[in-house]
Amino acid sequence: MKKQHDTIIVLDFGSQYNQLIARRIREFGVYSELHPHTITAEEIKAMNPKGIIFSGGPNSVYGEGALHCDEKIFELGLPIFGICYGMQLMTQHFGGKVERANHREYGKAVLKVENESKLYANLPEEQVVWMSHGDLVTGLPEGFVVDATSESCPIAGMSNEGENLYGVQFHPEVRHSEHGNDLIKNFVFGVCGCSEGWNMENFIEVELEKIRETVGDKKVLCALSGGVDSSVVAVLIHKAIGDQLTCIFVDHGLLRKDEAEGVMKTFSEGFHMNVIKVDAQERFMNKLKGVEDPEQKRKIIGNEFIYVFDDEASKLQGMDFLAQGTLYTDIVESGTATAQTIKSHHNVGGLPEDMQFKLIEPLNTLFKDEVRVLGSELGIPDEIVWRQPFPGPGLGIRVLGEITEEKLEIVRESDAILREEIIKAGLDREVWQYFTALPGMRSVGVMGDERTYDYTVGIRAVTSIDGMTADWARIPWDVLEKISVRIVNEVKHVNRIVYDITSKPPATIEWE
């Protein structure tokens, strides 16, 4: 990335939220990069950042395997902001006291600002924040003062303003912290003195150059699904290298209703790209027969997907690279070197060791909302840019347990009804992601005066900015009623509809 803008470095101590910190900073027009906690002070100095943020993490600073950083980082003279574990690490380094809390604090808490340091400038004295910690600071290091408290956390915020050192026990990067964005903004601009200067135009310029340098005169295969991510990847790479790109669209039989036809029409006819369609439904279904475990399903689908590409590439000449639409959120949900794994992702797990391609993942530093902005900048039509997020394993992870043709058809038809009614109600931009899932359970019902014993369909709809955290969508009851009535009446073997009202965390958006 060209250094024509200020940069904030985020050190990764294993928090599942660490990518969010960088995302929040980018929202302000300031570039931010995430780096492992093992990075050296010299390496940071060479990057010339304006400030450093220590992320949270699942460890205890006194526990076995506790993560630490190069202590010379504290001697660089840069502003440092420690979040949760990062605050505890800072406390330990400067001689303060960290202890195990009586009860792990998880969820919303009311924060009371006791000292208006630069971090809390122009913020209310009381605010709701998101806590997620098992340890807490019980003794301040020398030179530090208490900035904020909560009912369960006497030192919820601290600072040494003379040294530009700040710490908070809560997570300002999570949307549940109502003034978290403003607090991070105060650090970035008020403490570090950053100026806005990073935007999507910069990203496009740098990525096009990077793709051309990486690929040279070689050829690239793109895993095109018609979803937002792969569409943006295809258009970006096509813009960089033109006809050196060949798109392969694999119809694995796990797509939404009418999706395969739509993909071919849009990209082959509309964008004039070289798109090869592979009909592989039977191949995938044979591999998935009898498989119930979700991780195994993801791995099988991921492996088979790449093997199909291998087969197709062998028919083509000189294909060296495989392009994928891996996002920042994909990587964090699959676990980084320090993050605890939640679930494997199809773009970052399940790749065979003997894969014959080198990977190109031009979106792997972007979040979903940034990808949409990028798509618009590249001139991709709104109907594609604003398409629903759809996982690579497709409906394979929306049918819980073993996948059968009957179950796929139920999900495919019910999902089409849900999408149609959400669009009719004008909620398609308001609701970030919505889909149906089949939990595999049957229940007793009565239809036409006869007893039935049929499937239950689950509806999942969430509001979110970037997929890292999400709230369940408050869809109007009359809209939910229409959806429910239509699915039960129009989709065979369904007699009950349930609505998922769980936020993320603790649940993930997808059910598998």
Swiss-Prot record:
State the EC number(s). 6.3.5.2
Known role = Catalyzes the synthesis of GMP from XMP.
Residue limits of the Glutamine amidotransferase type-1 domain? 7-197
Q: Which gene encodes it?
A: guaA
Q: Which GO terms describe its molecular function?
A: ATP binding; GMP synthase activity
The protein's name is: GMP synthase [glutamine-hydrolyzing]
SUPFAM superfamilies xref list? Adenine nucleotide alpha hydrolases-like, Class I glutamine amidotransferase-like, GMP synthetase C-terminal dimerisation domain
Name the InterPro entries for this protein: Class_I_gatase-like, GATASE, GMP_synth_C, GMP_synth_GATase, GMP_synthase, GMPS_ATP_PPase_dom, NAD/GMP_synthase, Rossmann-like_a/b/a_fold
